[in-house]
C-alpha cells in the first residue's frame, strides 16, 4: 500500500504525472469524436433565428390543426420523469400517437408546407452575415439589372409598371462601385436542418433517409448556403425568369473539412433520381465529378455510395481501360484486324479460330453503365480520345460537371485536360460547379470565359446565373486549429524538433503537444522516403514499432497506396509521411495534427495541408511548420495566413506569430513566388542530386549521420562497385610467355 496515497486521500494534491494526465483528458482532440456543432462561424442572434424557424416548422407539421398549447402539454408529459405510472403511460400513448401522425404525414409526401416560416430579407441577411457567407452574382451588371427590372414588373401593379418602365428606359443610371457590389449581392434562404431537404425542397425520400442514417443533422456553412441554391431556392429567383426554377452555375470557396462533398453530391443524386422517374428508358452518364488525385476520387465514390443506396443511382470510380463511350469505328477496325490475321494464317484450324474470337470479345471492354462518373483528368481524357489516337468523343447526356479542388484542376498542370472534359460535355443545359478552399481571380475569369464560350458555340439565348459563394475569408486557414511556426535553423534542427514531438521530455507552456495520428508533409518524394527511413525505429516495439509509420507518394502502385490509406484510416498506422499528394480533399476526421517538415510551395498549399486536421468543426488540432535559414525569404505568406486565422478565431491569448516577426520577414516578389510554386525551395529540389559536390544539397540532406560516416560508406560503396566492374570486364588475351610450349630453347645471345 502507498502510504502517501493513504495520507493524502482527503486532499486535492496531485502528482505531476496525474496532473498531466487529467489535463490531457480535459483537452479536446479531433480523434476523440465529432463536434457537437460542425459550424465554424455562428452567433447567438443567428442561432436564435434558425431555432425559431425550426420550431415554427415543427409546430405546423405536427399540429395538423391542433393548437400550440396542446403540443406543449404533450412535450411536458413526455419530459415528466417523476410522474405516476398512469400519467407516464398516458404520455407514452400521446407520444406514440404523435409519432404515428408524423409518420403518416411523411408518408403522404411531407405535405406540411414551410412557406409560412420563410425568413424575410433582413433575417436572411443576419443569418448569412453571422455565418460569414457571402453570395454574389457574377454576371454582367446589364443582365442583373434587366432581370431585376423584369421581377419588379411582375410584382408591381400595372399602372406603376408602365411609368417605371418608361423612367428606366429614359434615364439609365451609372452605378458606383459600392452600388455595383450591392446590386450583385444575393441573400438566399438558409437551410435550417437536413429535414428541410425533404419537407421544403422535396428531394427523394430514400435519399433523405440515407442522409439521416449517416447522422447529418446540423448543416455546415457551405451546406447551409449552397444546397438551397442548387435545389431551387425561390428567394433568389430574380436571377432568372419569374416563376421558373433555375439551377445556377456555382463557384464555391469554403474552408477545408466543411462538407463540400456532401454539398455537391446531394443535388446531383436527387436530379438523377428525378430524371429516372421522368425518362426511365434513357440511361447513361448524367454527371461527371473530376478530382486531381486518385485518393480524393476514391473518397468521393465511397461517400456517394452511402447516399445512393436504394435510389437506383450508380456511382463509379474511373479506372484504366474503362469504356465510357461507344465509338462506331472501334468495332469495324477490330473486325478488320481479325480478318487480316485470318487471311495471313489461312492454314489455322478451328481451335485457333475460337481463340481469335475469344480475344476479340475480351479485348474490348463493355461501356460503363453508371450515372455518376468520378475520375481524374488524364484517365477520362485518355478514355474519350482512345489514348490520344482519335478525336475527343462527346458525352451528350452529362447535365452536371463538378470540379473538386478546381484551382488545381485549372492550373497549368491539369488545365488542358480539364477543359477537354468540360468541352466534351455537349448537353445544352449543362451546369458546372467549381469547389475549393482556395480560388484565385484567374480561376473565376477562366470559368466565366469557358461558360460564355460554350454558350456562344451552342447558340442558346437562355442565360443561367453564375453565382459565387464564399464562406469566411478567401484563401484563409480554418480558425479552429492551433498554428505553430517554429524556427529550426538547419535540417538537423528540424529532425531534432520532430523527434521531440514524438518523444516529449518535459511539459512547458511554450512546448507543442501533438499526439498521433498525424501527417508529415515534405517537398519531394526522395525527402519523404529519407525521412521515413530516418524515423522508422523511433517508435518503440511495445507500441508497434516500425509498422506504425509509413510513407505515401505517387511512385507507389495503386494497390500499395490503397493499402496504406486503409491502414491509416483503421488506426494501424499512426504517422504518415507524404508529399502534397494528400494535401487536398482527403478526409481524415481523426487526425490530431499536421507537421510541415518542409514549408509549402505557396500560401494555398499551406491552407490545404493544415486543413487535414480540424475537420467538421473538431477542436484541438495542431499545425506545426518548421523553417530553416534557407526558408526565411519564403515564410511571410505563411505567417500572414496564421495571423489572419487567429484574428478570425477571435480568441485571446498569446499569438503564434508576433508583430515584430511579421515586420521583419522579407516580402517575396511575384517572380520568386512563381518560381517557388513551380519548383519549391531550391536547396531541396530533387535535381540537385546530380551535382555531387553541391553544398546546398549536402546541407539539406535528411540524415543524422556525421560527414565522416557518410564518407566511409561512400568509399565502401565505391570499392564494391569497382570490384564488380573488374569482375565483369573480359580477361586480356594470353601473351607468348604463356603459350604452353614448355621446351627450353637455351640462352639467347
Curated annotation (Swiss-Prot):
GO cellular component, one term: cytosol
The keyword Hydrolase belongs to this UniProt entry's keyword annotation: yes
Protein name: ATP-dependent RNA helicase rok1
Species the sequence originates in: Aspergillus terreus (strain NIH 2624 / FGSC A1156)
Residue ranges, compositional bias (Acidic residues): 69-78, 111-120, 331-355
Residue stretches making up the Helicase ATP-binding domain: 241-457
Similarity section: Belongs to the DEAD box helicase family. DDX52/ROK1 subfamily.
Extent of Low complexity compositional bias: 17-28
Keywords attached to this entry: ATP-binding, Helicase, Hydrolase, Nucleotide-binding, Nucleus, Ribosome biogenesis, RNA-binding, rRNA processing
Annotated catalysed reactions: ATP + H2O = ADP + phosphate + H(+)
The protein's Enzyme Commission number: 3.6.4.13
UniProt entry tagged with the keyword Cell inner membrane: no
Any matching Pfam family: Helicase_C
Primary location recorded for the protein, binned into one broad class: nucleus
Sequence ranges assigned to domain Helicase C-terminal in this UniProt record: 497-665
Domain notes: The Q motif is unique to and characteristic of the DEAD box family of RNA helicases and controls ATP binding and hydrolysis.
InterPro entries: DDX52/Rok1_DEADc (IPR044764), DEAD/DEAH_box_helicase_dom (IPR011545), DEAD_box_RNA_helicase (IPR050079), Helicase_ATP-bd (IPR014001), Helicase_C-like (IPR001650), P-loop_NTPase (IPR027417)
Start-end of Basic and acidic residues biased regions: 44-54, 98-110, 167-178, 690-699, 707-716
UniProt biased composition (Polar residues): 728-737
Binding locations of ATP: 254-261
Sequence motif: Q motif, positions: 192-224
Domain of life: Eukaryota
Subunit composition and interactions: Interacts with the U3 snoRNA and is associated with the 90S and 40S pre-ribosomes.
Coiled-coil annotated residue ranges, if any: none
Described purpose of this protein according to its UniProt entry: ATP-dependent RNA helicase involved in 40S ribosomal subunit biogenesis. Required for the processing and cleavage of 35S pre-rRNA at sites A0, A1, and A2, leading to mature 18S rRNA.
Amino acid at each position: 500500500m502507498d502510504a502517501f496515497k493513504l495520507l493524502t486521500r482527503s486532499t486535492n494534491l496531485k502528482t505531476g504525472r496525474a496532473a498531466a494526465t487529467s489535463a490531457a483528458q480535459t483537452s479536446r482532440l479531433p480523434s476523440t469524436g465529432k463536434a457537437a456543432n460542425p459550424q465554424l462561424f455562428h452567433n447567438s442572434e443567428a442561432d436564435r433565428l434558425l431555432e425559431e424557424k425550426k420550431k415554427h416548422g415543427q409546430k405546423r407539421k405536427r399540429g395538423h390543426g391542433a393548437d400550440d398549447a396542446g403540443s406543449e402539454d404533450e412535450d411536458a408529459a413526455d419530459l415528466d420523469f417523476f410522474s405516476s405510472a398512469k400519467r407516464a403511460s398516458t404520455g407514452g400513448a400521446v407520444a406514440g400517437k404523435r409519432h404515428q401522425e408524423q409518420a403518416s404525414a411523411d408518408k403522404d409526401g411531407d405535405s406540411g408546407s414551410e412557406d409560412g416560416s420563410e425568413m424575410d430579407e433582413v433575417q436572411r441577411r443576419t443569418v448569412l452575415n453571422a455565418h460569414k457567407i457571402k453570395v454574389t452574382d457574377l454576371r454582367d451588371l446589364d443582365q442583373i439589372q434587366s432581370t431585376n427590372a423584369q421581377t419588379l414588373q411582375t410584382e408591381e401593379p400595372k399602372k406603376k409598371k408602365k411609368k417605371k418602365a418608361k423612367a428606366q428606359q429614359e434615364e439609365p443610371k451609372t452605378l458606383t462601385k459600392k452600388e455595383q457590389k450591392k446590386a450583385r449581392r444575393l441573400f438566399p434562404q438558409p437551410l435550417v436542418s437536413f429535414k428541410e431537404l425533404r419537407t421544403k425542397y422535396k428531394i427523394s425520400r430514400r435519399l433523405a433517409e440515407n442522409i439521416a442514417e449517416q447522422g447529418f443533422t446540423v448543416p455546415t456553412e457551405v451546406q447551409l448556403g449552397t444546397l438551397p441554391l442548387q435545389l431551387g431556392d425561390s428567394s433568389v429567383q430574380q436571377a432568372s425568369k419569374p416563376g421558373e426554377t433555375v439551377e445556377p452555375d456555382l463557384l464555391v470557396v469554403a474552408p477545408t473539412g466543411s462538407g463540400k462533398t456532401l454539398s455537391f453530391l446531394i443535388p446531383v443524386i436527387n436530379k438523377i433520381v428525378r430524371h429516372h422517374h421522368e425518362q426511365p428508358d434513357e440511361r447513361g452518364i448524367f454527371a461527371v465529378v473530376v478530382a486531381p488525385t486518385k485518393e480524393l476520387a476514391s473518397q468521393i465514390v465511397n461517400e456517394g455510395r452511402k447516399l445512393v443506396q436504394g435510389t437506383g443511382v450508380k456511382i463509379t470510380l474511373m479506372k484504366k481501360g474503362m469504356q465510357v463511350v461507344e465509338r462506331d469505328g472501334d468495332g469495324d477496325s477490330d473486325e478488320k484486324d481479325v480478318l487480316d490475321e485470318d487471311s495471313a494464317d489461312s492454314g489455322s484450324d478451328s481451335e485457333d479460330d475460337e481463340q481469335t474470337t475469344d480475344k476479340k470479345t475480351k479485348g474490348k471492354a463493355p461501356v460503363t453503365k453508371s450515372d455518376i462518373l468520378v475520375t481524374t483528368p488524364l484517365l477520362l481524357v485518355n478514355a474519350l480520345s482512345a489514348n490520344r489516337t482519335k478525336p475527343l468523343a462527346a458525352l451528350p447526356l452529362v447535365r452536371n460537371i463538378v470540379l473538386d479542388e478546381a484551382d488545381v484542376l485549372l492550373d497549368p498542370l491539369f488545365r488542358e485536360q480539364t477543359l477537354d472534359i468540360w468541352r466534351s460535355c455537349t448537353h445544352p443545359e449543362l451546369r458546372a460547379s467549381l469547389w475549393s478552399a482556395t480560388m484565385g481571380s484567374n480561376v473565376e475569369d477562366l470559368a466565366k470565359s469557358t461558360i460564355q464560350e460554350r454558350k456562344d458555340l451552342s447558340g442558346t439565348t437562355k442565360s443561367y446565373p453564375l453565382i459565387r459563394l464564399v464562406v469566411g475569408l478567401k484563401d484563409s486557414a480554418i480558425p479552429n486549429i492551433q498554428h505553430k511556426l517554429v524556427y529550426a535553423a538547419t535540417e538537423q534542427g528540424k529532425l531534432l524538433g520532430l523527434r521531440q514531438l514524438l518523444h516529449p521530455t518535459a511539459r512547458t507552456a511554450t512546448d507543442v503537444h501533438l499526439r498521433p495520428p498525424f501527417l508529415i508533409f515534405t517537398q519531394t518524394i526522395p525527402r519523404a522516403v529519407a525521412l521515413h527511413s530516418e524515423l522508422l525505429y523511433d517508435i518503440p516495439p511495445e507500441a508497434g514499432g516500425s509498422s506504425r509509420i509509413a510513407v505515401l507518394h505517387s511512385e507507389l502502385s495503386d494497390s500499395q497506396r490503397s493499402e496504406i490509406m486503409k491502414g491509416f484510416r483503421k488506426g494501424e498506422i499512426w504517422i504518415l509521411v507524404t508529399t502534397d499528394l494528400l494535401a487536398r480533399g482527403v478526409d481524415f476526421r481523426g487526425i490530431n495534427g499536421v507537421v510541415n517538415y518542409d514549408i509549402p510551395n505557396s500560401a494555398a498549399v499551406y491552407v490545404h495541408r493544415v486543413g487535414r486536421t480540424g475537420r467538421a468543426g473538431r477542436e484541438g488540432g495542431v499545425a506545426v511548420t518548421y523553417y530553416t535559414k534557407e526558408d526565411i525569404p519564403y515564410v511571410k505568406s505563411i505567417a500572414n495566413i496564421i495571423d489572419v486565422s487567429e484574428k478570425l478565431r477571435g480568441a485571446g491569448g498569446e499569438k503564434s506569430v508576433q508583430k515584430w516577426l511579421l515586420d521583419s520577414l522579407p516580402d517575396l516578389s511575384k517572380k520568386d513566388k512563381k518560381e517557388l510554386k513551380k519548383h519549391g525551395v531550391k536547396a531541396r529540389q530533387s535535381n540537385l542530386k546530380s551535382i555531387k559536390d553541391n553544398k546546398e544539397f549536402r546541407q539539406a540532406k535528411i540524415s543524422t549521420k556525421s560527414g565522416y560516416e557518410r564518407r566511409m560508406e561512400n568509399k565502401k560503396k565505391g570499392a564494391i562497385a569497382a570490384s564488380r566492374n573488374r569482375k565483369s570486364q573480359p580477361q586480356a588475351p594470353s601473351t607468348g610467355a604463356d603459350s604452353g610450349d614448355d621446351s627450353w630453347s637455351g640462352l639467347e645471345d
